């Protein structure tokens, strides 16, 4: 289970090619889904358009549960993109992984803490940006001193805690799922070196647990995409609302 990653050095920085590949694959898949489901918009939508409209309505309901929809409409595209991108990213490593030599080339990008924490930092940074944009820097800064000024240290700690939990929750769930799938796959193939019969027994014994865990991982991947999107909108609501 200990695999390395192909890296390159550029301008003194180290880049993980596996992560770059999987981020690109996830982005292309989401882009293709968006294009294919919206290229022929009609008053009488087909299955593809219905699918995209369902996603948009689902995200609109998420936003509506956290803030006024008139304001929240500004974040509909963000919510749809986050939900689709994270779900697709969660699913990429579910059916299989690809290892060449001792280097892992195909996995879920969200099974890497660097990616999930980067997503979390970007989201939290966006909430601060829109907070300042919609309330003004002076009014936004006062929120950190409310209801009493000595809450400032606690609110700063809260910002770091929100960022860490948002990123690490997603990473932990997806990474754990891929680890267990890898262990079950190893169980299915580990006994062939001893005998074909023993190997077949191991394979048959591992098939049902693998199928069950893949189904559960599909559910977990969807739930984690929902939670990430929901919390993004909750954090956004806290930053732009005049009640906070």
UniProtKB/Swiss-Prot annotation:
Topology of the protein relative to the lipid bilayer: Multi-pass membrane protein
Coiled-coil features, chain-numbered ranges: none
CDD domains: ATP-synt_Fo_a_6
GO biological process: proton motive force-driven plasma membrane ATP synthesis
GO-annotated molecular function: proton-transporting ATP synthase activity, rotational mechanism
Ranges annotated as spanning the membrane: 17-37, 75-95, 112-132, 170-190, 221-241
Keywords: ATP synthesis, Cell membrane, CF(0), Hydrogen ion transport, Ion transport, Membrane, Transmembrane, Transmembrane helix, Transport
GO annotations of cellular component type: plasma membrane; proton-transporting ATP synthase complex
Main location per the UniProt record: membrane
InterPro entries: ATP_syn_F0_a_bact/chloroplast (IPR045082), ATP_synth_F0_asu (IPR000568), ATP_synth_F0_asu_AS (IPR023011), F0_ATP_A_sf (IPR035908)
Statement: the UniProt record of this protein carries the keyword Transmembrane helix: yes
Location of this chain's protein in the cell: Cell membrane
PANTHER family named in the record: ATP SYNTHASE SUBUNIT A, CHLOROPLASTIC
Job description of the protein: Key component of the proton channel; it plays a direct role in the translocation of protons across the membrane.
HAMAP family assigned: ATP_synth_a_bact
Subunit structure: F-type ATPases have 2 components, CF(1) - the catalytic core - and CF(0) - the membrane proton channel. CF(1) has five subunits: alpha(3), beta(3), gamma(1), delta(1), epsilon(1). CF(0) has three main subunits: a(1), b(2) and c(9-12). The alpha and beta chains form an alternating ring which encloses part of the gamma chain. CF(1) is attached to CF(0) by a central stalk formed by the gamma and epsilon chains, while a peripheral stalk is formed by the delta and b chains. The F(1)F(0) complex interacts with SpoIIIJ and YqjG; YqgA is found in the same complex.
Protein family: Belongs to the ATPase A chain family.
Protein known as: ATP synthase subunit a
Species of the source: Bacillus subtilis (strain 168)
Gene giving rise to this polypeptide: atpB
